[in-house]
Amino acid sequence: MSRGLYPGRFQPFHLGHLNVIKWSLERVDELIILVGSSQESHTVTNPFTAGERVEMIRNSLKDVGMDLSRIYIIPMPDILMNNIWAHYVSTYTPKFEVVFARNPLVVRIFKEAGYKVEIPPAFNREKYNSTYIRRLIILNDNWSELVPKPVYKYILEIKGDQRLREIVGTDK
């Protein structure tokens, strides 16, 4: 059985992330989705809690009929030592053989630690980009088509859009 790791902050989880998960599951039997920066929330760059992000991811995967028995969703706090981060991750997760990542630092860290790294396609990175989506939310612009429907519904339900605008002082 093969198992891969897909690390990200998922602030918020969007359709690009969903496409990477689908792509990754074509290559491994099981996938660990690592929800990074789990200690962060209520900031402009990390507005959602780890628990909220886990719910966004799980609800989105259920919505598309994904087999959740093939998926682990694991929150993990940051450490400020990149040289041991890959080892740190391995202490939080089940064993994995391959890492799916596009972030150059993440790619470098896991390669140096001896892991196989596969770089997923960008899947329209200009649109499917959490920074861009957060900006649209702050501006009260349309972002609903950039995230899975369960994510959009959930963010409105928890008033995450209002939270983000209040954090930057632009509650319109």
Curated annotation (Swiss-Prot):
It is an enzyme of class 2 (transferase). The lineage of its organism: Archaea, Thermoproteota, Thermoprotei, Sulfolobales, Sulfolobaceae. GO terms for cellular component: cytoplasm. This is Nicotinamide-nucleotide adenylyltransferase. InterPro entries: Cyt_trans-like (IPR004821), NMN_Atrans_arc (IPR006418), Rossmann-like_a/b/a_fold (IPR014729). Its EC number is 2.7.7.1. It comes from Saccharolobus solfataricus (strain ATCC 35092 / DSM 1617 / JCM 11322 / P2) (Sulfolobus solfataricus). Pathway: Cofactor biosynthesis; NAD(+) biosynthesis; NAD(+) from nicotinamide D-ribonucleotide: step 1/1. Its main location: cytoplasm. One of its GO terms (molecular function) is ATP binding.
